Amino acid sequence: MVSIMLLKVEDLHVYRGNREILKGVNLTVEENEIHAIIGPNGAGKSTLAYTIMGISGYKPTKGRIIFKGVDIIDKNITERARMGMTLAWQEPARFEGIKVKNYLMLGMNEKYKKDKEIAEEKIREALKLVNLDPDKYLDRYVDETLSGGERKRIELASIICMEPDLAILDEPDSGIDIVSFDEIKRVFDYLKDKGCSLLVITHREELAEHADRVSLICAGEVIKSGDPKEVGEFYKKECGKCYKKVPDGK
């Protein structure tokens, strides 16, 4: 099967203050691929995610970000979202006064919005996939009455409803109290079956091994990319060197 490039990051350099966080990162994500990014704390994983999404304050000083064949380096977050890209934050936001069912409807794929019954069915399916009982959560508010883990699950449910071309997931298991990683993997597989590509920022070996491809970032550079187990073994052997090279930061 011929692979089709969805995202291509070329020679990406990003500064935060006076410090260079990303130092010439090169990365690709193919259509319908799960690509995991691993590395020590402070290596630049989250900075890469925020830069690709176009978050304010993460403007590259050099490099290109090609999405669907278009250089989006000068496009803002809204424009990138309209092109089919989304980001699930490591720390999900609160939305005072918005019920879960309305929040999930906001970014829902238009093909489901056309019919109210289909939309409601999709919302229920999404909540069940993230292990939340629809009857208990549909009319809850996305505010401080929900735990961080519950809001994280709702964020994942939102992406399930959205079915974007590219979902960037920053530590998708963070704050979620789970016995195993099977439910997160189930979300990954569901989205992939729907034709979505995933760029997953994680430090969990269990999630990285579920990816099609893994890239290791160390001190702002991608130092190895390829088979999940091969990259994982390389990281275990070289992780001490990586930690020594990484300053404080994201």
Curated annotation (Swiss-Prot):
<comment type="similarity">
    <text>Belongs to the ABC transporter superfamily.</text>
</comment>
<dbReference type="InterPro" id="IPR010230">
    <property type="entry name" value="FeS-cluster_ATPase_SufC"/>
</dbReference>
<dbReference type="InterPro" id="IPR003593">
    <property type="entry name" value="AAA+_ATPase"/>
</dbReference>
<dbReference type="InterPro" id="IPR017871">
    <property type="entry name" value="ABC_transporter-like_CS"/>
</dbReference>
<keyword id="KW-0547">Nucleotide-binding</keyword>
<feature type="binding site">
    <location>
        <begin position="39"/>
        <end position="46"/>
    </location>
    <ligand>
        <name>ATP</name>
    </ligand>
</feature>
<dbReference type="InterPro" id="IPR003439">
    <property type="entry name" value="ABC_transporter-like_ATP-bd"/>
</dbReference>
<dbReference type="InterPro" id="IPR027417">
    <property type="entry name" value="P-loop_NTPase"/>
</dbReference>
<keyword id="KW-0813">Transport</keyword>
<dbReference type="GO" id="GO:0005524">
    <property type="term" value="F:ATP binding"/>
</dbReference>
<keyword id="KW-0067">ATP-binding</keyword>
<protein>
    <recommendedName>
        <fullName>Uncharacterized ABC transporter ATP-binding protein MJ0035</fullName>
    </recommendedName>
</protein>
<dbReference type="Pfam" id="PF00005">
    <property type="entry name" value="ABC_tran"/>
</dbReference>
<dbReference type="GO" id="GO:0016887">
    <property type="term" value="F:ATP hydrolysis activity"/>
</dbReference>
<feature type="domain" description="ABC transporter">
    <location>
        <begin position="7"/>
        <end position="244"/>
    </location>
</feature>
